[in-house]
Amino acid sequence: RLVLDLYDQVGKATDEPRVVKHSQETRKGRDVVIAIDAGHGGDDPGAIGRKLKSKEKHITLSIARKLKKIIDKQPGMRAILTRDGDYYVGLRKRMKIARQHHADLFVSIHADAFRSPKAHGSSVFVLSRRGASSEAARWLAAKENAADLVGGVSLDDKDDVLASVLLDLSQTGTQAGSMSAAAKVHREMGRIGRQHGKKVQQAGFMVLKSPDIPSMLVETGFISNPGEERKLSSRKYQQKMADTLFKGINAYFQAEPPVGTLIAMKKHGPGQKSAKYVIKPG
């Protein structure tokens, strides 16, 4: 088996004591970054309501903006939007935006639709194992031409075996984080309305495929259901939805704050232990 010890800014041992100067950001801890993805946009309206003809792209953007306002008011938290207007952003571009901002969590907001107007309830999705496997194959196939980092490590100068191990390690941790965050959001969603799925569901949605960012996709309700369309079109309910999403997101970061963040320092103190991962055969 292979044991990797990952340390947060550990220097080489020396015989002489040395003075370490930390930046102000290091001393106070960085913000956790949440990438909020408003589904669809521009020429892609998403689902359209049966009665009010509400467009999914407008509902998702409104909820995303409200959620960002809530997050940005919290000490140690910051949100970025993958789109902040009525324009289309490609699915992989959405992932790229999140990675460029070093996001700690990716939340994609949608409104569901079905041919039957009786379908109802919210759902929360994370990436399926099959989807993760296909994405891993894509990353490994393209690693020679990629300068992207996975979990802070470049794959382009690693041999195939080591690159595969590092990618698998990153994906395993990411999927665990995705499920943990999604479960907390799913629980909060159940407190404000009916749910289409009794538990977090798994699917191969493209926007969930970042190998190093915990990600979830939230279906806020069925826009094809007249009753839920009416609620989703209401500014009051959109605010309620944003508040609910924040509660789940905040619960996740309070329970599992990333190392080096202000939330982690408040919880554990400045001295944080390394994280140890054990890779077992098979």
Task: List each model region and its residues.
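Catalytic-core regions of hydrolytic enzymes
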Residues: 12-162, 171-183, 187, 230, ...
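A broad, low-specificity signal marking well-ordered, structured residues that form hydrophobic/aromatic
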Residues: 2, 34, 122-125, 206, ...
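Extended, charged alpha/beta regions that create polyanion-binding interfaces
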Residues: 1-16
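Active-site-adjacent mobile loop/cap segments within catalytic or ligand-binding domains
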Residues: 4, 115, 166-268, 281
